[in-house]
Each structure stands twice: as C-alpha cells, then as structure tokens.
Amino acid sequence: MPQKSGRPVVTQLGKFEQYLIEEFFDDYRAGGMSRHTFTRRVAFITGSMAAAAAAMTLVGCSPNEVPRATDPMPTPSPATSSPGTGTASAGAVPGAKSPLSVPEGAAGLLTATVKFPSGGTDISGYLARPEGVKPGPAVLVCHENRGLTPHIQDVARRFAKEGYAALALDLLSREGGTASLDRDAVPGALTQAGAQRHVADFKAAYDYLNAQDYVDAGRIAMTGYCFGGGITWQAATELTGLKATSAFYGPAPDLDKVPTIKPAVFGVYAELDDRITGPMPELRAALDATDVRHELKVYPGVDHAFHNDTGERYNEAQATAAWNDTLAWFRKYV
C-alpha cells in the first residue's frame, strides 16, 4: 500500500480496521476531525486504549498524540436523533447538494423499512422502488462506515427513480440499528461484526429481493461506498447470483479470490485517493488475468468520498459522471 503524506503503512491490523483507521487519520491530519474524535473512533475499532495507542502510532501519530494505555475506554454517548433504519422524514435530505438528490415522498416512488431473516435474526433495510407491480431490476446498496444514513437512503431513491428496486441494508440491525449507536462507535461496531457477516446479510437480502413480485428474478446488482465499496468487492467474490457490481473507492478484495468473481464489476476510483487508488493496478492486473468482465475507472481531480454530496469532498461533475457510468454499467449487464 502506498504512503500518503509520509504516513507509515499499517501492517498489523485487519483489512477493514486498517482501512478505517487510515481514513480517520487522514481526516485528522487534514483538520477535518478532532484528536478527541479520532481517538474515540480508533478505540472503538481496536477495543482497548492500548491497542488504540499502538494503531495510532502505526499510522503516524507522534507520542504526544496517542492516548496512554491506562486511559479509560470511551463511553458510548446516548444516541441522538440521527436517522437510521426508521422511515425517512418527508422532504429534502439534510445537507444534500447533488442535483440528483431525490427527496423522501417524491412522486412515483414507494419507500418503506423492510425486514428479512439472516442468521437467525431480522435485518432491517430501507427499500425504495417505483410505483406499480411490473417486475424490474433491483440493486443492493451498502452504506459507508457511518451506517445507514439519510444520504444512503437518498441514493436508494435515486436508483428507484431510474427504475430499480433499491434495498439499502442497515448492517448494524443486530446492534439495534445505526440510529441507536454513538456515531463514533459505528465504525467499530461494523468492523467487530466482520465482513463475512455483512456479506451473509447481503446474500439474505438478495434472496429477499429475488422473491418479490416487483423484481425481475435474477436481475440484481450491488453497489457500495467507501467501507461499503469494500464489502461490495468481497460480495462480488461470493454472491454468484449478482449480475453486476459498482464499488466506489473501497478496499480491494483478496487478489487470490478475484478468479471467483461472477458479476460484471465496475470500480470507481478518485485520482487523489492514494490510499485506495494506489494499489488499484494490482487489482486490474488480477482481473485482466481472468475472464471477469470489468472496468476500473479513475476520476480526475477528486479525493476519497467525492460522491457523497453531504460531505466536504463532494464534486458535482465527477460524482455525476460516476453515477451515470454506474447506471450505464448496470443497463449493460443487469
């Protein structure tokens, strides 16, 4: 993995733990996250202050920036009114800047919170689909490390406006749902659950959608953003029924699993996102050595998370281009 701004490469964490801690370190160094928040999030990911101190040192923090191993673990704060698995409030999405944004209650769409079984429990998801009963294609949507947010619900509605039944899972359903958790504890809860559990939940979601009369059986795609992009890549190696995937700047799958990919895979990368785009040629080479239908595209002049129009890195031109490219990919293969 390439270095960014002189930061050492982390080598002693799991893939998704490493991915998130490095992302938060970059936000902290750029002034977009306080040291207090950075420390809390790393502690929730690693499970102890000693491990948090070690991880923060590995990513490049100085000794006076890391907590003492004997410091108490942060206490999760009571959840605020952050929306999660509940039905979204009608109207515009808070902070949305994209002209593609679709408000809750938009004409011609049906939205609801649905539940389906996975691993002996019920998983919640936000479903958005066109009105009517004519069967059409569907797409599974995997959220970022923030959990199921109004932005991701908006993305689901954008797909619904394009004719898809879009199901955005709350991968923290077993923990009570995104809305029930301290926002700093959400990334740690996601990594502690493990990518395999998340992929299994998407398999259950696939089966749920495939059984609905408004879905044209078998015509199901998947997309994900940041952390969700990594889950989408892993799902592509395991969920053989998927027709296509579009992973937005997520960590790559294990290269030895690339030959098992069945769907047509599209990768969205940001030119300035060294951490994810830097290793991308290795993934491209692995894909080139197979019969997997694929395209990995780098969007110029933008950084990680450029598609999220509620964030500071949003770029309207490139986000719109990546969205249109994803739709074109799905039209071709789904």
Task: List each language-model region with its residue ranges.
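Acidic catalytic loop of the alpha/beta-hydrolase fold
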Residues: 272-277
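N-terminal secretory signal peptides
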Residues: 1-37, 46, 56, 60
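Short beta-strand/loop motif that positions the catalytic acidic residue
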Residues: 267-269
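C-terminal catalytic histidine-bearing segment of alpha/beta-hydrolase fold enzymes
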Residues: 293-334
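Short, proline-enriched alpha-helix->beta-strand connector loops that line the catalytic pocket
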Residues: 260-265, 290-293
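Primarily recognizes the serine-hydrolase "nucleophile elbow" in alpha/beta-hydrolase
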Residues: 203-262
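Conserved loop-alpha-helix segment in the C-terminal half of the alpha/beta-hydrolase fold
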Residues: 280-291
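Serine-hydrolase catalytic machinery in alpha/beta-hydrolase-like enzymes
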Residues: 4, 27, 34-37, 41, ...
